[in-house]
């Protein structure tokens, strides 16, 4: 969405210089990725089924019948096949985000990008979205997830990166990062989190 000033990215064994990529190469790189946004970004005047079909038809130039078959399959995978003909305004935030995930997975991305996918949800709806993401992870999808859901990250991620002011301050396997952080800042962060979850009273 924004062009980096420097850096490279390697997807599916192919490395690209992000500062110099353009035209056809940029288009092909984008086809290998899918994005799930904080605020769903569904087309409000299209049904759940049509939202999932859109990229398949417009980007992949797929025939409508094949696009619908794949879209229904993905909606079934996220538990929303019975909502195929519902418009976003008739779905909860959690349901809308699951449609957004189905839309992203329908494109068969090599890399799935998720930007705080639960931040716009009521707490009671977070679980259903995290379960959907965990299921996709277990199916072998490669994901880059931005999240403050620490327990989820700890249990699902294979690599954890802590960022502060745009800089990496901790990077490693979840067990190492959560149990033995090297950065003072990360240790401080976990200490604050632990204090927040500890009860301030006893019964």
Give residue ranges: language-model regions:
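C-terminal boundary and immediately downstream tail of ABC-type ATPase nucleotide-binding domains
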Residues: 164, 175-203
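ABC family nucleotide-binding domain
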Residues: 1-164, 169-170
């Amino acid at each position: 969405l924004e062009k980096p000033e420097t850096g490279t990215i390697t997807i599916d064994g192919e490395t690209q210089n992000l500062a110099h990529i353009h035209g056809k190469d940029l288009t092909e790189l984008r086809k290998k990725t899918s994005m799930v946004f904080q605020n769903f970004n569904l087309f409000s005047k299209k049904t759940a089924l049509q939202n999932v079909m859109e990229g398949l038809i417009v980007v992949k130039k797929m025939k409508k019948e094949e696009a619908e078959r794949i879209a229904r399959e993905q909606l079934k995978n996220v538990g929303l096949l019975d909502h195929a003909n519902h418009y976003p305004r008739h779905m909860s935030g959690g349901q809308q985000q699951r449609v957004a995930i189905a839309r992203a997975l329908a494109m068969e991305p090599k890399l799935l990008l998720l930007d705080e996918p639960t931040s716009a949800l009521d707490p009671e709806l977070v679980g259903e979205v995290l379960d959907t993401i965990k299921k996709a992870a277990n199916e072998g999808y490669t994901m880059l997830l931005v999240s403050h859901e620490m327990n989820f990250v700890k249990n699902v991620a294979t690599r954890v990166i802590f960022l502060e002011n745009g800089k990496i301050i901790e990077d490693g396997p979840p067990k190492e990062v959560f149990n033995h952080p090297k950065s003072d800042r990360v240790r401080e962060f976990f200490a604050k989190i632990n204090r927040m979850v500890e009860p301030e009273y006893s019964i």
